[in-house]
């Protein structure tokens, strides 16, 4: 199960030997173990481990990760700090409107443009961060969209320890805020007793 999950995850998101991640979640957490450790090692990428939460930004600047694996609570905390700083800059709210317009551009080009517009935000994350993988709980769609506006490629997924653990996930090409993606290769999903949502 674990090996097939690694292969399936790497079909959803491109991770190369040139990539680096900064690990902040405990390795006994199955999501971190799969997404932040086994998949990274299998792809030949590098892992740095944070020194402490109080030194997280310093660790980002030192290790310059290209991929960040997080849970929604951590992204919510980081998000509130970023948005507060962006809005504090003269014209900061206008930058967010520009960021929203940029996300309507096609694919990777929109992320490249947004990363230039929000260069200071990207510098705080070491200047190399491209992709944020989020799992273990639902990510607020507004936070998802704000990270996209800032020029980050956000992918969400869902799973259980019993599914080793990832069973559905966004792919690099199919991303919809407020969702967790489609079943990964080798997985099937079925909604039982659907409600209005």
What is each model feature region?
Residues 68, 109, 113-197:
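Conserved AMP-binding/adenylate-forming
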């Amino acid at each position: 199960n674990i090996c097939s999950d690694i292969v399936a995850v790497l079909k959803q998101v491109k991770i190369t030997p040139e990539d680096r991640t900064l690990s902040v979640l405990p390795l006994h957490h199955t999501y971190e173990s799969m997404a932040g450790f086994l998949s990274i090692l299998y792809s030949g990428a590098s892992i740095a481990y944070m020194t402490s939460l109080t030194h997280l930004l310093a660790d980002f600047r030192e290790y310059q990760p290209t991929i960040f694996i997080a849970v929604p609570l951590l992204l919510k905390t980081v998000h509130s700090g970023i948005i507060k700083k962006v809005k504090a800059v003269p014209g900061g709210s206008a930058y967010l409107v520009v960021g929203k317009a940029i996300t309507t551009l096609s694919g990777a080009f929109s992320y490249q443009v947004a990363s230039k517009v929000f260069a200071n935000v990207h510098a705080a994350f070491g200047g190399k961060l491209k992709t944020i993988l989020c799992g273990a709980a639902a990510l607020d769609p507004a936070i998802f969209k704000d990270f996209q506006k800032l020029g980050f490629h956000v992918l969400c997924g869902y799973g259980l320890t019993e599914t080793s653990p990832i069973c559905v996930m966004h792919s690099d090409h199919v991303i919809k805020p407020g969702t967790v993606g489609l079943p990964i290769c080798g997985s099937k999903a079925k909604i039982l007793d659907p409600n209005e949502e």
